[in-house]
């Protein structure tokens, strides 16, 4: 069953009409997983080895599935029509030739849409609707918020696990395995991304590879960045920690990150542009002699990175052409994650998940752990 209301689907249909788009087409196949099929029909699939296609017009929804998914789709999906691909000789092109006969303009997600369809349907105009779909999904409905809260609750349990197991004797891999096992035991369906554990000099890497090394945690600054999926919806938090005695420079990094986080929370208000939130905190970090090297936060939902994106206003003309200001709205869910990374000294990032209301509500409770 889908979590969103009929009103949300009607809102999407209205936006398609405004753009003079006849139909939206979403596709999940082995190299592509489009969460919008789940969003509009409630039909959940594994992120691997799956197939489904959704045709959505202002009047109805048609879900096309493989033979192995058909019986389950009949029970679980909400759609006006559910088609077994077997009836069309397992050819999606055959189905689309029938369904798109009178269609002139089709809305797609350009970044992930297979190029072969352009060649097969040359008379149809394909138009990117990524901005429309991100805007629609950015405002969460009550049932979506319930699932995100559950994912965040599991992440909060993870904080407790980290506190209980953090030591100079444990390896990053051992800590990661203990954490991940507990997250699954607590109810997570899967991780929302590979867990990152860094310490010592390696903590300066924002996205290290591999995400841990199977080495003992090093003295100084460190962090654990992790999240889970619960029935499709994501959480994402970073728990910063210190091991042993830290230097004055490291103390200043930690204090500045904490101040930046608290300032950000104070700045979160309805209708405030996200770039202004980022700019204010970026200036604070600069005044303390450091640099904010990444966005201050990102939306959460069926995707790990959803709208809103809490980043700086683009500086270059080409980027500004495609840029659109986004303002904070009630029932947006997003991360706040100020971080500072100084080569040779260490890195610190504090990240929590926030539900926007009249005042921001923190759904997770990450804070610095001193060991």
Where are the regions a protein language model picked out?
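Active-site neighborhoods and metal-handling regions in enzymes and metal-associated proteins
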Residues: 1-371
């Amino acid at each position: 069953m889908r979590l969103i209301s009929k009103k949300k689907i009607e809102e999407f249909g209205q936006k398609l009409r405004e753009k003079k788009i006849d139909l939206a087409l979403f596709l999940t196949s082995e190299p592509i997983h489009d969460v919008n099929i789940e969003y509009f029909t409630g039909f959940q699939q594994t992120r691997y080895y799956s197939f489904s296609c959704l045709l959505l017009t202002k009047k109805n929804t048609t879900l096309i599935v493989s033979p192995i998914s058909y019986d389950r789709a009949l029970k679980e999906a909400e759609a006006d029509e559910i088609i077994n691909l077997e009836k069309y000789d397992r050819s999606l092109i055959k189905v689309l030739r029938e369904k798109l006969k009178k269609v002139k303009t089709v809305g797609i997600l350009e970044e992930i849409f297979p190029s072969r369809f352009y060649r097969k349907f040359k008379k149809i105009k394909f138009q990117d609707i990524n901005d429309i779909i991100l805007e629609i999904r950015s405002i969460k409905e009550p049932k979506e918020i319930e699932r995100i809260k559950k994912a965040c609750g599991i992440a909060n349990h993870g904080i407790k696990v980290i506190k209980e197991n953090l030591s100079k004797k444990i390896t990053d891999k051992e800590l990661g395995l203990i954490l991940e096992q507990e997250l699954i035991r607590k109810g997570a369906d899967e991780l929302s991304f590979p867990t990152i554990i860094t310490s010592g000099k390696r903590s300066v890497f924002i996205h290290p590879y591999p995400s841990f090394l199977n080495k003992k945690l090093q003295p100084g600054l460190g962090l654990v960045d992790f999240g889970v999926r619960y029935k499709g919806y994501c959480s994402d938090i970073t728990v910063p920690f210190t091991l042993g005695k830290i230097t004055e420079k490291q103390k200043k990094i930690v204090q500045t990150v904490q101040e930046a986080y608290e300032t950000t929370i104070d700045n979160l208000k309805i209708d405030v542009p996200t770039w202004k939130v980022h700019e204010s905190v970026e200036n604070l970090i600069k005044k303390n002699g450091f640099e904010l090297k990444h966005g201050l936060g990102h939306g959460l939902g069926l995707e790990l990175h959803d709208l809103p994106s809490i980043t700086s206003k683009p500086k270059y003309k080409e980027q500004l052409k495609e840029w659109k200001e986004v303002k904070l709205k009630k029932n947006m869910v997003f991360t706040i994650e100020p971080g500072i990374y100084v080569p040779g000294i260490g890195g610190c990032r504090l990240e929590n998940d926030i539900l926007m209301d009249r005042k921001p509500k923190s759904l997770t409770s990450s804070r610095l752990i001193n060991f």
